A protein has these predicted regions:
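A conserved beta-strand/loop capping segment in the N-terminal third of enzymes
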Residues: 108-142
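Flavin (primarily FAD) cofactor-binding/catalytic cores of flavoenzymes
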Residues: 2-82, 130-241, 245-253, 259-499
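Conserved N-terminal glycine-rich FAD pyrophosphate-binding loop of Rossmann-like flavoproteins
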Residues: 82-109, 268-284
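Tryptophan-centered motif/residue detector
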Residues: 86-93, 120, 147, 363
Length: 499
């Protein structure tokens, strides 16, 4: 079913993908991708050190792996806690029917036409089905990402959860995982955190949410079965896309009623970044002075991103959906198996509250990143905004370098500082530093290429002695000396003979 219309794969569609994959292989060959491996291998106690460990194998993680591979960096691997085919939010916590992104964006294709979602979709369902599809169903996107991983042979270890990241004295990074067969230890030269929206923190829950038993409270990013709330009263706090998605999912699952409590007196209507979306913004934002980058982000936070129109209509079409504007939740009171919600406009009973209130960046709430806590430079450390433009949430985001690398706080030892700068944040918290590159599908390819090029540059500089040694010892002759005749030498031979 594609956007309300029953759609079947084309007859013989099993041959559609092989044909596409053959075309993709030819395109990659013509582009010389992946490039020839060039990074010298490193060893520790006779064990090979991984060049790049990528934490997360969702959209950003897979695109990062592909970009690194295309750049000739092949000693790489991603690790994801989810089973194969369930990485990212698409078939777990996401509750929208379709992606919010336009279907024609190139996404993670890295400039390769046959690697696009469109090519994958049309190979199976045809051009007409693609043209009739308005937006991409999230399940189809997940299937595409599985194909993307497989067709590029990207190395991923699933069901492998990071439990600790350590900074070694020699500048290497120690990673401790819990895998399906027990603990796993990995040492890497670089680490890329591709951990999504909550990649450096946890769901943001207002203090009022903590005043009642946890059995009444969920966050929109949690994975839970909405069907258990059939016939129940569900309250959703928030007005963004995830609030609408959760409200709609509850209604479609048979909730008796859904109340949306919205702090603002109106739902945001204008996506400010939509007015400047361009390759100029993608490539230029990183070059802006801090004051300008901060001004963009503060205004975006102030106005907020509106939910898609179709997401709001998905809720409002239900007669048992109720929007309460200008209604911040002031107090929650347990009353047996229900909770009473108090707002400035009244009291409302509910059986479940879903807070669609975003995510915080807080290393302290992620034990696996304890080595980074208070060692990574944050925006509040690097920039002092003018009066009236302060924003504590934005101030907690990492202040990143040009290749998404963390920058060390002043006062660290040389070894600590070096190790910190070898961890790269290719996740949502990179947005204040790099712009909307890691926030979704539209600019993920330019972002991954920036990441890969930066890591490649750092490897070459770090290994420069080994490269220079190779340069000096290279003695493969391109020509033998038999390809020409020295005219002057021939004249001298002739003179000697004539004499």
């Amino acid at each position: 079913m594609i956007n309300g219309r029953k759609t079947s794969p084309l007859p013989g569609h099993s041959g559609g993908l092989p044909e596409l994959e053959a075309r993709l292989a030819r395109e990659l060959t013509m582009l010389e991708r992946p490039a020839k491996p060039w990074v010298p291998r490193s060893y520790l106690d006779r064990c090979e050190v991984l060049d790049v460990a990528v934490i997360g194998a969702g959209l950003c993680g897979l695109t990062a792996l592909a970009a690194l591979s295309f750049a000739g960096i092949d000693n790489i691997r991603a690790f994801d806690r989810a089973p194969s085919g369930r990485e990212g939010p698409w078939v777990t916590s996401a509750r929208m029917e379709t992606l919010r992104t336009r279907k024609d964006l190139a996404g993670p294709a890295l400039g390769v036409p046959s690697l696009t979602f469109r090519a994958w979709f049309e190979a199976q369902f045809g051009t007409r089905a693609y043209e009739e599809m308005t937006l991409i169903p999230r399940e189809a996107w997940m299937a595409y990402m599985v194909w993307y991983r497989n067709v590029l042979a990207l190395p991923v270890s699933n069901e492998t959860n990071l439990v600790g990241l350590g900074l070694r004295e020699d500048g290497l990074l120690a990673l401790n995982f819990m895998g399906p067969e027990g603990p796993v230890e990995v040492v890497a030269r670089r680490v890329v955190l591709a951990t999504g929206l909550d990649g450096l923190g946890a769901p943001r829950m207002p203090d009022v949410a903590k005043t009642v038993s946890g059995r009444f409270v969920r966050h929109s990013g949690d994975v839970f079965d909405m069907s258990v709330w059939r016939g129940k009263r569900v309250a959703v706090v928030g007005a963004g896309a995830s609030a609408m998605d959760n409200a709609a999912a509850a209604l479609e699952a048979g909730a008796a009623r859904v109340d949306l409590f919205i702090r603002r007196t109106d739902i945001p209507r204008v996506e400010k970044f939509g007015g400047v979306a361009s390759l100029g913004m993608t490539h230029g934002y990183i070059g802006l002075p801090d004051a300008d980058r901060w001004a963009f982000m503060v205004e975006a936070e102030r106005t907020q991103i509106p939910p898609p129109r179709h997401s709001v209509l998905r809720v409002s079409r239900h007669e048992n959906a109720f929007f309460h504007l200008g209604s911040p939740v002031l107090k929650l009171t347990e009353a047996g198996d229900t909770v009473e919600i108090e707002t400035p406009k009244g009291h409302y009973p509910a059986d479940l509250l879903i807070f669609a209130t975003g995510f915080d960046v807080d290393f302290g709430r992620r034990p696996e990143f304890s080595a980074l806590n208070d060692r990574v430079l944050l925006w509040r450390d690097a920039y002092q905004p003018p009066v009236g433009q302060g924003n504590d949430a934005l101030g907690s985001y990492p202040y990143l370098g040009p290749a998404f690398e963390f920058l060390p706080k002043p006062g660290l030892s040389a070894a600590e500082a070096a190790a910190i700068s070898r961890v790269h944040c290719f996740a949502y918290p990179a947005v204040p530093s790099h712009g909307k590159i890691t926030s979704g599908i539209p600019a993920v390819s330019p972002g991954a290429e920036r990441l890969a090029q930066g890591i490649a540059r750092s490897f070459f500089v770090e290994d420069r002695a080994r490269h220079f040694e190779t340069f000096m010892s290279h003695a493969v002759a391109e020509i033998t000396g038999e390809e020409w005749r020295d005219a002057d030498a021939q004249d001298k031979i002739k003179e000697h003979t004539d004499g």
